[in-house]
A protein has these predicted regions:
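Active-site-proximal alpha-helical scaffold in enzymes
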Residues: 16-46, 88, 94-123
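A short, structure-level motif marking secondary-structure boundaries and short turns
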Residues: 13-14, 74-76, 100
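Preference for short coil/turn "hinge" residues that link or interrupt alpha-helices
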Residues: 7-10, 30, 47, 61, ...
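Flexible glycine-/small-residue-enriched beta->alpha junction loops
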Residues: 29, 33, 39-93
């Protein structure tokens, strides 16, 4: 409403962790393809760092300890069918299909190199809207993805510890 859209316009949010923005655009495209809409404004951003912790308070709370759930994990990263973190699913898939740590690291290095080359070639310039961030060091303009690991190597990937199991193969790479 504050953006100037009429009250009868449909709007909703999507909570699919990192895939939310992409899913919003895919749903928008489907609405246009199916003839449900002529024009759709869609986009997204993820902010997992600020996902709230939630408590069951509908019926109130009596004396004693109260548990909170991490909504980022519970709503987006928890396997509802098996009752464990999606990271465990990644480990299970790696084991089932015999995808070892070296194979995963090699894939990660390749992905990082492709992203680095695309960033250096300016392929993302039209995809990212620059914005100002204020922090204790002053204002900073963010105009490119900060998490591409320039100069990624197998050696740098192999220094990463397993993320989900002590002897696992899945890392942050």
């Amino acid at each position: 409403i504050n953006a100037g859209f009429p009250e009868e316009s449909a709007a909703w949010g999507i909570n699919q962790v990192c895939g939310s923005g992409l899913r919003a655009v895919a749903i928008a495209a489907q609405h246009v393809q199916l003839g449900d809409a002529d024009v759709v404004a869609a986009g997204g951003q993820e902010n997992m760092s600020l996902s709230p912790h939630v408590a069951h308070l509908r019926a109130g709370h009596k004396m004693g300890h109260m548990s909170y759930l991490d909504s980022m994990v519970r709503d987006g990263l928890w396997d509802a069918f098996n009752g464990y973190h999606m990271g465990q699913t990644a480990e299970n898939v790696a084991e089932k299909w015999q995808i070892n740590r070296d194979m995963q690291d090699e894939f990660a290095v390749g992905s990082q190199k492709k992203a680095e080359a695309a960033q250096k070639a300016g392929r993302f310039v039209d995809e990212i809207v620059p914005f100002k961030v204020k922090d204790r060091r002053g204002d900073k303009i963010v105009e490119q993805d900060e998490y591409i690991r320039h100069g990624a190597t197998m050696e740098s990937m192999q220094k990463l510890r397993p993320a989900f199991l002590k002897d696992g193969t899945v890392t942050a790479a």
